[in-house]
Swiss-Prot record:
Organism: Bacillus subtilis (strain 168)
Name of the protein this chain belongs to: SPbeta prophage-derived uncharacterized protein YomO
Top-level taxonomic group: Bacteria
Length: 166
């Protein structure tokens, strides 16, 4: 089989899957559209937003410590990779979170994402968790800088075509 030289057209073709929406039927009369494949740039955007959410909440007088971190991660997936139109401002985002996580629809939406995409998220969060052990001795500003650097590394690493695991 003849090999093709990589060009912009081939790159565009390979990333087209990230723009495709998929209809997920939650009940007989309720559906949602999701973006089943997590593009590295949108995943980075989601993780970066998650990092700043706690500070934004505290700035608005919201007690973010009462929010379950795992559920917030899943909620952030739904926010970034569905068409629910969850707002960006932290007060309304928290309001949506509190309602959505208690709904019957939340686990249905989460379970509709492909395992491949969830693995991508798991790998990204694992890399972030790895650095948190060192964060206890760092200032808040140093922590945020380091996390953002690692998120950028993850974005760059997940875009590699070598087939090696990062």
């Amino acid at each position: 089989m003849a090999s093709k030289k990589l060009n912009l057209s081939l790159i565009e073709e390979s990333v087209n899957k990230y723009d495709k929406k998929e209809k997920v039927q939650l009940t007989d009369d309720v559906h949602v559209f999701i973006y089943p494949y997590f593009s590295p740039s949108r995943l980075t955007k989601m993780l970066t937003e998650m990092i700043s959410d706690q500070q934004k909440a505290e700035d608005k007088g919201i007690d973010f410590s009462k929010i379950n971190t795992v559920q917030w991660v899943f909620f952030s997936i739904v926010k970034e990779f569905s068409d629910l139109g969850i707002p960006n401002d932290i007060k309304n985002k928290v309001k949506w979170y509190l309602k959505l996580v208690d709904s019957e629809f939340f686990p249905m939406i989460i379970n509709s994402f492909p395992k491949e995409s969830m693995k991508k998220l798991k790998d990204a969060t694992k890399a972030l968790e790895k650095i948190t052990e060192d964060l206890l001795t760092m200032s808040h500003q140093e922590i945020n800088k380091l996390i953002l650097e690692k998120v950028e590394e993850i974005e760059t690493g997940s875009g590699e075509v070598s087939g090696e695991n990062n």
